[in-house]
Amino acid sequence: MSLMFLRRAGNIKGRNIRFALQRGSVGYSQQSSEACKNFLNTTQLRTMVQTAALHGPKPMDSSHIKVTNVKELKPLPEWKSLKFGENFTDHMLIMKWNREKGWSTPEIVPFGKLCFHPASSVFHYGFECFEGMKAFRDEKGVPRLFRPIKNAERMLSTGTRISLPSFDPAELAEIIRKFVAHENRWVPDQRGYSLYIRPTFIGTDEALGVHHCDNAMLYVIASPVGPYYSSGFKAVKLCCSEESVRAWPGGTGHYKLGGNYAPSVLPQKEAAKKGYAQILWLYGDEDYITEVGTMNCFTVWINKNGEKEIITAPLDGMILPGVTRDSILEICRERLAPKGWKITEGKYSMKEVAQASKEGRLLEVFGAGTAALVSPVKAINYKGTEYEIPMPEGQEAGPITSEISKWILDIQYGKEPNNPWSVPALP
């Protein structure tokens, strides 16, 4: 599997990308300059990469991975008995970084505990980010990753925000692909089941003080998981946030930081006491819809202009750029827009959703994320009034939600084998 294939799989060529030389190593960040696109893959860039590799700190490199196999493989669990995040594969992957030396050789080692100094920066100042992605087994037995380059890009973006070291996302995606190939037997062979992959990026300086990290670690663990809904879709009720906000302008809501998740647990617990599965996070005097729980939110309605529309909040700095979100938008533009649907990334408020419900224009609402793929919503409590979302009789999801779910699942499980979003993870 070539790195160029992974780049194509993530549509990198269509993005604004810049490689920069940072302290003798190659860094990566998104820029708006059109000229940056034309710079990618040029002779000049290749020369810079080679120079950095020879004379500066070592860049992340997927070409060689050191493997130390466990002495005895664990028995595989019964797939039907799986609980999310409780079973782990035989091995994990570790890469260390030092400002002087650069990236260490990636190592696949037996799964086990990690040991850190009590003053490590990850424990005190929040130098931590993570990703969530999955591998699926197709009908021919081939394990497949879903758009791994997108997760690698997002991890770089998040890590950069908290001053963790740079890397080439294509190298990380390829390293993860090789790790999944090594743990191949842990990828379930039933539709609805998958191998959940958790890359984690942390600062490991052994000293107190808030400053950029001189040492870091990126490690990957994996856990086989069952379907989010064991017996098909299960629509949920939401409760709008009134006292808490998930993110705010100028903050870090659009980064996958661990610190964005812990503060949501207490409000979520209070909502659960009232019988609601998730919180619909709102922002501002207009009660703009941002996210639902830990997922992006989509609304399907007839808008005020009488158009059939699928709308989700824009990436304005408060919204996590979800891989599932991006995939849904792309597939809807490709397959539903030609059928008269308007696909929109734009601000819209809970006030507008409530009004649409009163006028019979509200059709469907669903959350979207890696864990559930899509999570249909059947009711939203807003300022003490519960607004019901219509459902087909005897079903737990509307037709658009169901169709989107099937389209993406078919890609994930290799039903569309030539789709660039599906990356084989063979040894």
Swiss-Prot record:
Pfam families in the record: Aminotran_4
Q: Which GO terms describe its molecular function?
A: branched-chain-amino-acid transaminase activity; L-isoleucine-2-oxoglutarate transaminase activity; L-leucine-2-oxoglutarate transaminase activity; L-valine-2-oxoglutarate transaminase activity; pyridoxal phosphate binding
State the reactions this protein catalyses: L-leucine + 2-oxoglutarate = 4-methyl-2-oxopentanoate + L-glutamate; L-isoleucine + 2-oxoglutarate = (S)-3-methyl-2-oxopentanoate + L-glutamate; L-valine + 2-oxoglutarate = 3-methyl-2-oxobutanoate + L-glutamate
Matching entries from PROSITE patterns are given as: AA_TRANSFER_CLASS_4
Which cofactor is recorded for it? pyridoxal 5'-phosphate
Q: Which top EC class applies here?
A: transferase
Q: Is Mitochondrion a UniProt keyword of this protein?
A: yes
Q: Name one GO biological process term.
A: L-leucine biosynthetic process
Family of the protein in this entry: Belongs to the class-IV pyridoxal-phosphate-dependent aminotransferase family.
Stated name of the protein: Branched-chain-amino-acid aminotransferase, mitochondrial
Whose protein is this, by species?
Schizosaccharomyces pombe (strain 972 / ATCC 24843) (Fission yeast)
High-level lineage: Eukaryota, Fungi, Dikarya, Ascomycota, Taphrinomycotina
